[in-house]
């Protein structure tokens, strides 16, 4: 029961890392993302595939990207 309640309050529940990253790239672009999160997979020959591979292995980087996504979603909600 606690897990269900936790997931209901999780704004990222049901959103894949690929969807999240794709939306960020469409909104900010790779160059801007590389300034926001200083990782090579955003700087040198960036691709969704290589970035997903890195983010799935690297918790701190994934958390930063998820936080950027959440801020973007809050900004979109305020402007509607």
Swiss-Prot record:
| UniProt cross-references to Gene3D superfamilies, sorted A to Z | SAP domain
Give the record's subunit note.
Monomer.
Q: Which Pfam families match?
A: VF530
Q: What is this protein called?
A: DNA-binding protein VF_0530
Q: Look up and give the organism this protein is from.
A: Aliivibrio fischeri (strain ATCC 700601 / ES114) (Vibrio fischeri)
Question: Which keywords fit this entry according to its UniProt record?
Answer: DNA-binding
Q: Report the function annotation for this chain.
A: Binds double-stranded DNA (dsDNA).
Output the superkingdom of the source species.
Bacteria
What GO molecular functions are on record for this protein?
A: double-stranded DNA binding
């Amino acid at each position: 029961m606690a897990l269900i309640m936790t997931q209901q309050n999780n704004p990222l529940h049901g959103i894949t890392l690929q969807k999240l990253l794709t939306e960020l790239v469409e909104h900010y672009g790779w160059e801007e993302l590389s300034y926001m999160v200083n990782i090579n997979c955003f700087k040198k020959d960036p691709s969704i595939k290589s970035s997903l591979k890195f983010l799935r292995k690297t918790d701190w980087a994934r958390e930063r990207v998820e936080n950027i996504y959440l801020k973007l979603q809050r900004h979109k909600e305020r402007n509607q």
